[in-house]
């Protein structure tokens, strides 16, 4: 008999330790809390998209105008980020005011400048005496291979995303940072599929953990419940899905790929009170949600990055293991929603279209 604890056992123990009952789902009868909703279900969080109409690209802002404690964990080998060193628990700044996710590769990091302008106009930022400096970390994904690469999100795009932000359910699929996202690229873009951005939330009594993810992975996306591929690499004729890893094991050769031409980026947020050390741990655990749904993941071609935010709006303390475990579940659900909400474009079909 296997005596090692399962993921469900760990979640059950964490909930018992934290003293919370599950609002949607019953741990006692073996069910994991149900997911749905969005990251905006977390108090203190707003989301806004800017989607460029000239080619599939854009940016997505996660606003925390009252400030949120933040952490980060980077697992891919080709990340593109801004203002992430300050999230190290050893460093001074304790709160951020927004996280920017953007297409456009490194050019897209300029969207954070637009978010800073938006926040400064509203008197929001880290008080340095002579000014308030908005703290806006950012991460980007590579979508320059979809359409005209000279068109990419800039500071104005970031500003417009902030102006569009609200606490309502955000759009999913081919919008914002997910507008140019694709998956299943191990055998080249000619066999890839369209992806997008997705969101989800898990609610327990008195606390919420939410996620939003722009899925631009080199690997395939799987539904962990069934083990089936939802979106990914296609056969050479483009008419059906293949399992990339199984194809490789059967001897199919990979074409030359350039590092950094993929990347999945996302944010998890909760309304519980967390420290910088704890948010960093939550971001680390949240990557398990990518590992459950994407294969291969965290590759040399990806810059997979997850931020974690704690708004503290519930005023509740919570077991960090519980929050991290729920964050991984929320990330996994957001990944699935990202590919299922996507719609195909020329040469890139979406899930359900083949």
Language-model segments: residues:
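A structural signal for small-residue-enriched, beta-sheet-centric alpha/beta enzyme cores
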Residues: 32-106, 110, 121-354
